[in-house]
Amino acid sequence: MKVIAVDKVVLAFSGGLDTSVCIKLLEEKYNMEVITACVDVGQPRDEIERPAMVAKELGNYRHYTVDARREFAEDYIFPAIKANAVYEGYPLSTALARPLIAKKIVEVAEKEGASAIAHGCTGKGNDQFRFEAVIRSTTDLDVIAPIRDLNLTRTEEMEYARSCGIPLPSDKLYSIDENLWGRAIEGDILEDPMVEPPEDAFEWTKPIHETPEDPEVIEIGFHGGVPVALNGEELEPVELIGLANEVAGKHGIGRVDIMEDRIIGMKSREIYETPAAFLLLEAHRGLEQLTLTRSELRFADIISSTYAELVYSGLWHDPLREDLDMAVNHMQRRVTGTVRVKLHRGSMRVIGRESPYSLYSEEIVSFEDKTLDQREMAGMVKNYALQAAIYSRVCRKEN
């Protein structure tokens, strides 16, 4: 394998086995000075503090911790809400975070004058595409993926870690990836698609038998398609998403168990918890139904699937995604108002919505109103199914 001749590299670092092994590999196999960086997109506090401690323990490496929570909410999650971006039933929590993490790692590398960026992705997952698509779209820095490039198995990683004195992780049942928008759960027992996920795999969502007996009604305020308030209280983006996670999660809302089609073509059983995403997306769609025209709603469905496919596939910087954002932002300018949602025992439904841009007219809909002259409908109805009528006549002639 050709070794890239570089002096300094910034490693996207979590402090786990993969990236800890990468530190030593980058030094020994690539002869580079390693700088580590962790990007905060809403992980638990211990997952933000651990990388700095591990980097120090492994060799006192220079380490960066970058707080990107607000940027993640405003520039990634909110555009996804406006586009109703969901991939195969999955609200894209991990997929949305990766381009931002890559962006911040690039910024650290440029600040340090590094020649390369490294990550700990394997050759079977989606993240290698998501990281490298952003890096190669925004910089000329080299990209190194030691685990993938050296074709290491998990067992080989652990053997190498032992030889280097790297502490091995405790035997955890699950591998977790968590951010503001969701929690992804993986583990050996979950790889069998016939095995129900054990209850101990979940943290954000309650099992149905532990949810409140009484339903809860919550009001969500939107401005231009973006959630801005809960129960009449305007909140900062990070706080609003966190509170929405708590409210929906305690009612058992937000669990996802799907067979997901990965970028490379393989199917994978994936488990997610995304309570805030379920709640906010449902409310957003409810408000769109009140404020967008029928043709806009139909086109929004097309945008939603295309947008989600681009994000999932790591193509955040594809020009089409930017084009779609422009169209979405124009359509969303009237998606302002309040939506009332009832949560109970793992279910939710929109039970009320209002907007200054409402296209609903109670007067016209009323059976007692004569604003719309019913007699004018006769001509429209007569020719409404014209093609179907012609087709039927043609078929009768054939018979």
UniProtKB/Swiss-Prot annotation:
Keywords linked to the UniProt accession: Amino-acid biosynthesis, Arginine biosynthesis, ATP-binding, Cytoplasm, Ligase, Nucleotide-binding
Transferase found in the keyword field: no
**Enzyme Commission (EC) number:** 6.3.4.5
Task: Summarize where L-aspartate binds, as residue positions.
Answer: T122, N126, D127
Matching entries from SUPFAM superfamilies are given as: Adenine nucleotide alpha hydrolases-like, Argininosuccinate synthetase, C-terminal domain
Class in the EC hierarchy, top level: ligase
Q: Which Pfam families match?
A: Arginosuc_syn_C, Arginosuc_synth
Which catalytic reaction applies to this protein?
L-citrulline + L-aspartate + ATP = 2-(N(omega)-L-arginino)succinate + AMP + diphosphate + H(+)
Q: Where does ATP bind?
A: A12, F13, S14, G15, G16, L17, D18, T19, S20, G120
Query: Looking at the UniProt record for this protein, which Gene Ontology cellular component terms does it annotate, in alphabetical order?
Result: cytoplasm
Q: Does the keyword Cytoplasm apply?
A: yes
Q: Which InterPro entries match?
A: Arginosuc_syn_C (IPR048268), Arginosuc_syn_N (IPR048267), Arginosuc_synth (IPR001518), Arginosuc_synth_CS (IPR018223), Arginosuc_synth_type_1_subfam (IPR023434), AS_cat/multimer_dom_body (IPR024074), Rossmann-like_a/b/a_fold (IPR014729)
Which residues does the record give as L-citrulline binding sites? Y90, N126, R130, S175, E260, Y272
Pathway membership: Amino-acid biosynthesis; L-arginine biosynthesis; L-arginine from L-ornithine and carbamoyl phosphate: step 2/3
Q: Name one GO biological process term.
A: L-arginine biosynthetic process
Which molecular function GO terms apply here?
argininosuccinate synthase activity; ATP binding
Q: Where in the cell is it found?
A: Cytoplasm
Q: What's the domain of life for this entry?
A: Archaea
List, alphabetically, the NCBIfam families matched. argG, PRK00509.1, PRK13820.1
Subunit: Homotetramer.
The Swiss-Prot or TrEMBL record describes its family as follows: Belongs to the argininosuccinate synthase family. Type 1 subfamily.
Name of protein: Argininosuccinate synthase
This protein's gene is called argG
